[in-house]
């Protein structure tokens, strides 16, 4: 894993240009700006935080959506 170093703006500098690692909690408005300006957003859906596997939940939701559309 690549290491990050501190930059003058307070954010950590990432080895990848244009990518920031935030060292603190950000406000709701800052988070909205970050999401709207992002090219992509990825979520970790394993069971580190919750007891269910997130990918299993997605599969269940997609299966239910497929059943609803096929019944028409």
Curated annotation (Swiss-Prot):
Superkingdom of the source species: Eukaryota
Tissue and organ expression note: Highly expressed in FA (Fanconi's anemia) B-cells of complementation group A and Raji cells. Not expressed in B-cells of other FA complementation groups.
Family according to the record: Belongs to the HAD-like hydrolase superfamily. SerB family.
Protein name in UniProt: Putative phosphoserine phosphatase-like protein
Source species of the chain: Homo sapiens (Human)
Organism lineage string: Eukaryota, Metazoa, Chordata, Craniata, Vertebrata
């Amino acid at each position: 894993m690549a290491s990050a170093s501190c930059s003058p703006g307070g954010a950590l500098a990432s080895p990848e240009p244009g990518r920031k690692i935030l060292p603190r909690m950000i406000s709701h408005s800052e988070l909205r700006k970050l999401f709207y300006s992002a090219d992509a957003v990825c979520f970790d859906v394993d069971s580190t935080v919750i007891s269910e596997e997130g990918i299993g939940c997605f599969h269940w939701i997609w299966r239910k959506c497929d059943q609803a559309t096929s019944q028409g």
